[in-house]
Amino acid sequence: MTPPASKRACDQCHNLKEKCRRPNTTATCERCHRLRQTCQTARNLAKAGRKPRAATTLLYKLPASSFSPRAESLGVSHSFETTDTTYSNLYSPFDAGLGINPALFPELDRWERHFLNLMKDIVAPSPLDKYLIGSSFHKSHHRSFVQSMLRPAPALKNAAVACAAVLFGDKYTEYTLTSVEVGHRRAALALSELRALKISEEQDLVTALVLGVSMVTFAMHVVDGQPFLISHYTLSLVRPVYQSALRMDPSIMDYLMCLVSTETFECLLTAQTPTLRINEHDRPNVVDRYLGIASSLFAHLYDICAVSSLLRTTGGKMTAQTAQKVEDIRESLEQWKTSPPLNFLERFTVAETTIMLAQAKVLRVAAFLIIHRLYHPFGTHNSEALSFSRLIDMEFDRVLHLTGQSLPCMSFAYLTACFEITGREARTSAIEKSQRVVNFSKQSQRRFQQTLLSMWAAKDAGSQIYWFSLNDILNRKSRTWI
């Protein structure tokens, strides 16, 4: 009777994960015999059972943690404890440094804990801060990030790790390779959990919004990310309970508006209708951490998307009824005014109020420019279009000069202004300036420039392009407008 085949593969087959066929451990296996290789089993026997997470081999050298005892003296850890005591017993090991303390998150490897440890360190400037209005929002946003990691839902933890990885990979070259590996692994888990999520209670709604914003952030930092699809899916999930979101803490609505702006800006370019219409008076006297006091403009941007979609469907036929809809939108925009809270000037710094007022201005002017191009193709009736374009460009210049930073979430407005630019020198200058204006991520800069170059090439070729036909000549891949 032939003896049973050995269950232990030779070293060659083991390394290549090939099936090893041989009668016993001393014989040459079929693969090594065929390839005339030395067949041996010299490696040590592995211990039975699953390997502990702490024993996982890291592909890259782990940098020193940026944790500093100064955080204690500056009151960093206490700022979290005073506002949320639900997980107060967890703050001590967390603030002691995740990179060397696996007790809080035993399921994470050292690299993942290291990224979270860097991200939670509120003492140093964080990549989380770059898309906020200003410093008035930094502490609360950091608190929100930390709390999302400490909640029981594993989806939020996966999303937090994915975001931390790509944010640091985008900013620091020493993290680039590791961030890709860690970020994609955790993002895949988070997206799978987002698809499986059903909203049956308030906490499910919060989880969906935080997950959606986190995954949109991740997608904006990676090649072939799909921020539009993620925002669209999340908003479709949230739409049946939108009225519940309005009754919740305003900071929760900030997350929803982040998704709304991502989807709306893409819909404006592709002549599609967004998932949600945020009514002008849904958020009175509210300051959004991303959009400032410009949230109420999105009702009118939704209406522009709807008309643009109609024009594209009908082949650009501007009927009297459609023209009346466009004029109604224009009139609403002319009457629109900001509605900041009463303590607006006292509550925020001069730089922050400057940024917020400028955000509202450039987005409103961009809406007027789009309406103009619904009537007139690019390259015609340029006088009014160029006036709008210059107004937007000058506002960006003014804010860059006064504050040293760009306008968060307003890259789309700058794009509409740049569409009108002609002349090699002016276009070269616009591309160079986009490095300062579009600063959310390297991928967002690349996508911005690719879209702009495609548009200019189509204009130079003599194509008749209305706003509602932009998608026919632009790259159809999902873009990033932050």
Where are these regions (language model features)?
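Start-of-helix signal in alpha-solenoid helical-repeat scaffolds, especially tetratricopeptide repeats
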Residues: 158, 206-209, 252-253, 257, ...
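Charge-rich, intrinsically disordered regulatory segments
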Residues: 1-140, 146-153, 458-481
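Acidic/serine-rich, low-complexity amphipathic helices located in mid- to C-terminal regulatory regions
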Residues: 216-314, 475-476, 482
